[in-house]
C-alpha cells in the first residue's frame, strides 16, 4: 500500500573473518521442524548476499501507538503530544479499552503491548485500520498462521483472546478519531525522507551470511525488511520472517544494530533437547533468577528463557558488529542498557569470543557445552561478570 525501497548488498565484506569460508551449516533435517525465524521450514542453503527493504507502515504504527494511548508513563515520555491530541477525542469506554489492553498484556502477561500485537499481526496481510479491526473481530486466520510459527504459545493466545474485545474497541477508536489521516499527514512524510537518507549506506553491510556463520543455520531469507515507524520508540521489535520495526529518529548505527540484533531472534532451536536442558539449567542459576526478578518489567525479559535469549542475541550482536567495524563500547553499553540487567550478555560475549579465537564453532554447540560444563553458571559466571565490569576494566576501555 505504501512505497518501499529494495537495496542489495554487493560489497562491504567484513574484515577479520573468524571462520574463513562459510562453514557447513546445520541442516534442519527431514522432519517438519520449526525454524528460529518463526516459519516452519525444511532444509535450506546458506545465503551469500543481503537485500535491504525499507518501508513505512500505518499498521505497525497504529499497533505501537496503543502503548501510549493507555496513559502508560513509560511511553508518555516519547508520545505525550500524540496522547494529548487523541485523548480528549476518546469516549470513556474507549479510554477504558486502552487501559484494559495494557492491564492484560503488560501488567498481567508481562509482555509489551506493541511487540505482542505487532508479532501476531505480522502473520496476516492486513494494512489498513479497517482490516486490522476485522482481524481483531475474527482472528481465526491469524491463529491458523501463528500456529505454524515458533512463536505460538497457548498461554499467549489465551491472553490475546482475553484482550480482543478491548483491542477491537481501541482500534475502532483510532479509526473513528482520524488516525489514518493523522499518520499520513504527520508521520509518513518524515518516514519517507528518512528512507531516502538511509538507502545509500545500508547496502554496504552484507550481514546475512555473517549472522548465519555464527548461528549455524540459514535465516529464512536474504531480504531484511525494515519498517521505519513514528511510534515504536523506545523499542526495536522483531516480527515473523526476517523483518523488524525500528524508529524513524534512530541514527544509522542504531538501525544497523537493530537489523543485526533482530535478525538473530531466536539464536537457537529452543525445542532441541540439549538446548532445552541447557536453558532450563541456566534458568535456575541465582544470577539469572535475580536479574529476571529485580528489574523494571517494562523492559520486557520477564522470564528466564526470554532473558537468556535476549542476552544471547546481545552478545552475538556485539561480535557480529565487530566484524563490520560498527561495534559499541560493550562495557559502557551493558552497564547502562535496561538498568544494567544484561550481565549475562557480557559473560557470553567474553567466553564465546574467547572460544572462537581457539576453536570456531556455532553458538548453539558452544552454549550447550558452556552451560553443561559450568563455564556459564555459578561462581564462574559471577567471576566473569565481576571482572568484565571491574573498575580496572572500565578504565582500560576508556
Predicted regions and their residues:
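Post-HEXXH active-site segment of zinc metalloproteases
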Residues: 270-297
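Active-site scaffold of zinc-dependent metalloenzymes
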Residues: 145-152, 208-212, 225-256
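N-terminal secretory signal peptides that target proteins for export/translocation
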Residues: 1-19
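Bacterial N-terminal signal peptides
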Residues: 20-35
Amino acid at each position: 500500500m505504501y512505497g518501499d525501497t529494495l537495496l542489495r548488498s554487493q560489497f562491504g565484506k567484513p574484515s577479520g573473518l573468524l571462520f574463513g569460508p562459510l562453514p557447513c551449516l546445520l541442516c534442519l533435517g527431514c522432519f517438519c521442524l520449526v525454524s528460529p525465524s518463526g516459519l516452519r521450514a525444511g532444509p535450506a542453503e546458506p545465503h551469500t548476499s543481503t537485500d535491504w527493504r525499507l518501508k513505512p507502515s500505518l499498521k505497525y504504527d497504529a499497533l505501537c501507538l496503543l502503548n501510549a494511548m493507555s496513559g502508560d508513563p513509560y511511553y508518555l515520555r516519547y508520545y505525550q503530544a500524540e496522547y494529548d491530541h487523541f485523548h480528549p477525542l476518546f469516549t470513556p469506554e474507549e479510554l477504558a479499552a486502552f487501559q484494559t489492553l495494557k492491564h492484560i498484556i503488560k501488567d498481567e502477561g508481562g509482555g509489551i503491548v506493541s511487540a505482542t500485537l505487532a508479532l501476531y499481526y505480522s502473520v496476516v496481510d492486513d494494512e489498513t485500520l479497517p482490516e486490522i479491526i476485522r482481524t481483531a473481530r475474527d482472528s481465526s486466520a491469524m491463529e491458523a498462521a501463528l500456529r505454524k510459527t515458533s512463536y505460538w504459545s497457548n498461554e499467549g493466545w489465551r491472553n490475546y483472546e482475553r484482550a480482543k474485545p478491548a483491542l477491537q474497541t481501541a482500534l475502532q477508536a483510532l479509526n473513528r478519531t482520524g488516525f489514518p489521516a493523522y499518520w499520513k499527514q504527520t508521520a509518513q512524510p518524515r518516514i519517507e525522507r528518512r528512507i531516502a537518507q538511509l538507502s545509500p549506506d545500508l547496502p554496504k553491510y552484507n550481514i546475512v551470511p555473517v549472522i548465519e556463520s555464527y548461528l549455524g543455520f540459514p535465516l529464512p531469507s536474504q531480504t531484511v525488511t525494515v519498517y521505519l515507524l513514528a511510534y515504536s520508540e523506545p523499542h526495536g521489535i522483531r516480527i515473523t520472517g526476517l523483518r523488524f520495526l525500528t524508529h524513524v529518529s534512530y541514527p544509522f548505527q542504531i538501525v544497523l544494530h537493530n537489523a543485526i540484533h533482530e535478525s538473530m531472534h531466536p539464536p537457537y532451536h529452543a525445542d532441541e533437547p540439549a538446548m532445552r536442558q541447557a536453558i532450563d539449567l541456566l534458568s535456575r542459576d541465582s544470577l539469572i533468577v535475580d536479574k529476571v526478578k529485580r528489574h523494571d518489567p517494562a523492559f520486557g525479559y520477564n522470564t528466564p528463557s526470554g532473558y537468556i535469549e535476549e542476552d544471547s542475541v546481545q552478545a552475538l550482536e556485539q561480535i557480529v558488529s565487530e566484524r563490520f567495524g560498527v561495534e559499541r563500547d560493550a562495557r559502557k553499553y551493558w552497564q547502562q542498557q535496561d538498568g544494567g540487567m544484561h550481565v549475562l550478555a557480557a559473560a557470553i560475549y567474553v567466553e564465546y569470543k574467547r572460544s572462537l579465537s581457539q576453536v570456531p564453532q556455532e553458538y548453539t554447540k558452544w552454549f550447550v557445552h558452556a552451560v553443561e560444563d559450568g563455564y556459564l553458571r555459578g561462581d564462574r559466571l559471577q567471576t566473569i561478570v565481576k571482572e568484565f565490569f571491574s573498575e580496572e576494566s572500565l578504565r582500560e576501555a576508556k
